[in-house]
């Protein structure tokens, strides 16, 4: 009976909603996404300002060029494919965007509504299935567009379905449809599970709640970084597969 009462107190997956232009939107997700986007844009302008326009590169430019080259070499050696020049910057941008949106939830920013109920102001956007599906579909459309640009409007679908064995075309089709689903649910599931654990920790007595909460918040930073990295790495892999040509196998 006690477990049932405690379970009923857990509110996970609840979002603050509003109606905009006849559509119901999750305002907490919009807020977290907007803040993360503004931080990414501000960071990009800051780094761009640090990059010199002369022939002599500065320290910041050399640092990020070295990191980019090292990341490209490691990923190419791991997946055995060459990466198009525009893919890595896109993947890094997605990584930073997801990372910041995940880490915003760690900030202790709360507010109390008129009913005296205290809730987190900044929630992880990845705990909203709409957010992760939008990201996954964006990646899905982008790498197929890149594949059509590289292989042609006819060659890309043929290569996509045929693969290396013609008889596996139905399996390849199912695999392709499953990519955005698995990409989104992997991120959503891990972040959503973190929200459940935080809700469970909130049911602890106040005098001991701080300890497990602090430990989990620290671990949550690690989980958010790992999930953002996996999403970005799979983005690179999908782009490489979509743009792969027969003569590039090695």
From Swiss-Prot:
Pfam families: ATP-synt_A
PROSITE patterns: ATPASE_A
InterPro entries: ATP_syn_F0_a_bact/chloroplast (IPR045082), ATP_synth_F0_asu (IPR000568), ATP_synth_F0_asu_AS (IPR023011), F0_ATP_A_sf (IPR035908)
Keyword set includes Membrane: yes
Gene Ontology biological process terms in this record: proton motive force-driven plasma membrane ATP synthesis
Single GO cellular component term: plasma membrane
Keyword entries, A-Z: ATP synthesis, Cell membrane, CF(0), Hydrogen ion transport, Ion transport, Membrane, Transmembrane, Transmembrane helix, Transport
Similarity annotation: Belongs to the ATPase A chain family.
Name of the featured protein: ATP synthase subunit a
Gene from which this protein is expressed: atpB
